[in-house]
């Protein structure tokens, strides 16, 4: 019913990714600054005293919980917006989510995730207009 997308990508791509997600109606997300490395394994930097290796690079971790039917479009949007065609662009994980509860209201499921103008509301309006 719901999935959590966890995307880890370059810090400088955050604004582009957020704008691309907003354009498709993804308005709720959590963003965390993280450090890590994958295949890239870090970078070597040259300083006044020589070179040194930085093995944990700064990255952004973006978390979004959304309806199953919006997962592929969201993944494609993040991938296109975050891509630089260089090693170390990042990775996207998708996890199942059993339950969603909005703390302030007690709303559960879809109602706990819905926001004015979000992707599901846009799709609902488009379906009504088509009828």
Predicted regions, residues:
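Positively charged, small/polar-rich N-terminal and surface patches that mediate targeting and assembly
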Residues: 1-131
């Amino acid at each position: 019913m719901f999935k959590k997308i966890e995307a880890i990508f370059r810090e400088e791509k955050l604004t582009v990714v957020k704008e691309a997600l907003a354009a498709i109606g993804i308005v709720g997300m959590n963003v965390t600054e993280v450090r890590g490395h994958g295949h890239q394994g870090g970078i070597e930097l040259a300083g006044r005293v020589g070179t040194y290796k930085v093995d944990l690079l700064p990255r952004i971790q973006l978390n979004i919980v959304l309806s199953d039917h919006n997962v592929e479009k969201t993944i494609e949007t993040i991938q296109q917006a975050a891509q630089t065609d260089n090693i170390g662009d990042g990775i996207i994980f998708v996890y199942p989510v059993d339950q969603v509860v909005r703390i302030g209201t007690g709303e559960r499921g879809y109602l706990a995730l819905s926001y004015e103008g979000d992707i599901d509301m846009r799709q609902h309006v488009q379906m009504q207009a088509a009828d």
